[in-house]
Amino acid sequence: SELALYNTVLSGMALDGKSFFYVNPLSVVPSACHADSRLQHVKTVRQKWFGCACCPPNIARIVSSIAAYAFTENEDTLLTHLYLGGSIRKTFPTGTLTLSIASDMPWDGHITVTLHADSPVSGTLGFRLPGWCPNPNVTADKPVRVADGYAYLSGEWHDGETIVLDFPMPVRLIRANNRVREDMRQVAVTRGPITFCAEQADNGENLHLLRVDVEDFGKDGEGVQVLPDSRFGHRTVKLLVPGFRQ
């Protein structure tokens, strides 16, 4: 769900929340969309609104209810699935515990969880270990038990205790399955939960002629420059990937 939320749901909406893609295919050729009447429903820039605007309100509803996807609970356990900055309060049989989460996901994998309680509270906290992270690390004063993709910490919690989660974000090159004819020789560049997009605005026309230089890319993406980008009033990250145009 994390990959879908970041790469499908959010990418359909502009950063300012005022324009949208109604359809959002993985690859768009502007000249083809403008020339072929069968493709004119595929817009090359986000649109302000639609005559039948069923999807934009659904995106807004998902974003506004994201906390329901981020956490689940039972009587003595609180599970964290999505690392959103903010706070969550959980009532255990022995008392109430508040988790304050400092997170800059999806751009930075360092997360600090600070616990607040009026008195000691016993219970279990579980944190999802993302599948995109090869070497996650959890630091706390409690033993860590890993099961089914989650790190579980159980015991008596005190006010001011912290749990630190580190999810390294190497840049990865993911190759498409050659059994899919249209995806032959295609790759995706990812970092953390984000799949990055090469756009004409940054790279010029004829994107199909771009090739990633696999040798310079490096085994673990060490040849890629990870640069902060705040051009649009929001902190994001852009990648400079070694490559060439055929």
Task: Tell me what each language-model feature is.
Residues 2-7, 12-116, 146, 158, ...:
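C-terminal beta-rich recognition modules with glycine/proline-rich loops and embedded aromatic residues
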Residues 103, 115-119, 128-131, 155:
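Non-cytosolic beta-sheet module surface loops
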Residues 114, 128, 139, 154, ...:
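Beta-strand residues in well-ordered beta-sheet regions across diverse protein folds
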Residues 120-140:
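Beta-strand-rich binding/interaction modules
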Residues 133-154, 172-179:
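Solvent-exposed beta-strand/loop surfaces of large extracellular or lumenal domains
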